[in-house]
Amino acid sequence: TSITIPDGVTNIGERAFYDCTGLTAVTIPDSVTSIGGYAFSGCAGLTSITIPCSVTSIGKQAFFGCTGLKDVYITDIGKWCGISFEDAFATPLQYAHKLHLNGDLVTNLVIPDSVTSIGGFAFWGCAGLTAVTIPDSVTSIGGSAFSGCKGLTSVTMGNGLTSISNYAFCDCTGLTTITIPD
């Protein structure tokens, strides 16, 4: 079953599609700014999802139990970095492991200069990442921002970084190179 949420909808409410195990695809319009807690929790049949750049917050465990997720599609890395993820299971990357930007699989993530902070849980579980480059414009990395990125081997940090929160790179078991400027 696939669902297209109509244009004009601004919020996907708490538990809106909770435990809809037969749900395989969801189209979310650009009008949506928030996804409520547990909104897609238990949707084990969901295989991919596109999160529009209009989304600014995703509630607690919104994607918990979405074990069939393979791919997450976005169009703006800067907007993704700014989403407020309430917990680790608010990000669909926890299960999907693969992030696509404008259709292309992201393995070497280059954060754009327009970004000043990377939010907590932003890339949690994105095992498809192998390298991350953080520009001078970024001053803070949120808690667990890159936790569980098991494929990540190198991180290059910019000069502007003043704060790296708890667990930012926790469980990045493949990480071998971290470049920090003087």
Q: Where are the regions a protein language model picked out?
A:
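Consensus positions within tandem repeat domains that build extended binding/scaffold surfaces
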Residues: 13-18, 36-41, 59-64, 87, ...
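Structural signature of tandem-repeat unit edges
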Residues: 1-11, 21-34, 44-57, 66-83, ...
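Acidic, Ser/Thr-rich peripheral helices and adjacent loops at domain boundaries
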Residues: 86-98
